[in-house]
Amino acid sequence: MDKKLISWMGVAITNHDFTPRGYQLEKRYFSTFIKADDIAFYVFCPYTTLLKFVESKKAKFPKKLHWEGLHKIHFILHKFGVAPAEEVIAEIKDYERKPKLKEFRELAIKLVAAHKDSVKPNENVLEYVEVRSEALGVHEKIPLVIDNHPVIEYFVEMVLPPSYEDQLRLTLYALLLEEKFNIDIDYGFAEYPLMKVSHKIQIDSDLRKDAITKRAEMEKIIIEKKVDREVPVDIKKCNTCYYQDECPYWRRGKIQFFV
């Protein structure tokens, strides 16, 4: 790998060999902090970076409250070691009809009410762990951490392999936790609570290298205010994008990046 120093408007990023852990902390300087989740969005589609960081557009999360409620239930189940009974799973699956986050929280409380006197909370199950890394130029509130391992959650009634962007998201979570707790983390988890399935995801050096490389690519786009390539439209992906309403290009046969 070329070891020359690349400079973008005074922001220097060292393009040199990565350590076996997947990244090199020396001589790495960033002008801004970027959320790990936004890096995953960039991998999903580079135009999301322009929309958010250059044009100040807002993503729309129509099921955000539903996700937060389901996450809270999932967290409570792990925290207190309560097995999700079939009737609970059935109620969770019916979450679409529930209009308020309060109802989810009430359900989560009910799940542990019968166990609160006999079951102690697991201190190794953490929620919304906030980490800010000067070395990586990344910050995030990690939704779920179990025994120091990051977890990504899928509240769907199927089990599909985690996408590449979600693997990078998990990797960035691991890098942040490694720095916060001064430990090595070699794997995380993808969990499917509605299916009672948990998969271990290895966080290897390639994923680590890719995560840091993608973060550097985002920095370049933000500074230059453009993406120097065209991205074919994938209708299935575009229809699930949180920036769809703000994207002026997705209905075309090809997304062109000009700002």
Question: Where are these predicted regions, by residue range?
Answer:
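Metal-dependent nuclease catalytic cores that hydrolyze phosphodiester bonds in DNA/RNA
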Residues: 1-150, 259
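Active-site catalytic microenvironments for nucleophilic, acid-base chemistry
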Residues: 56-57, 175-180
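Metal-dependent nuclease catalytic regions and adjoining charged, substrate-binding loops involved
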Residues: 123-137, 161-164, 179-259
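Acidic active-site catalytic centers that drive phospho-/nucleotidyl reactions
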Residues: 143, 153, 169
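Structural signature of nuclease core domains in nucleic-acid processing machines
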Residues: 151-158
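Short, charged, amphipathic alpha-helix that recurs within catalytic cores of restriction-modification
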Residues: 166-177
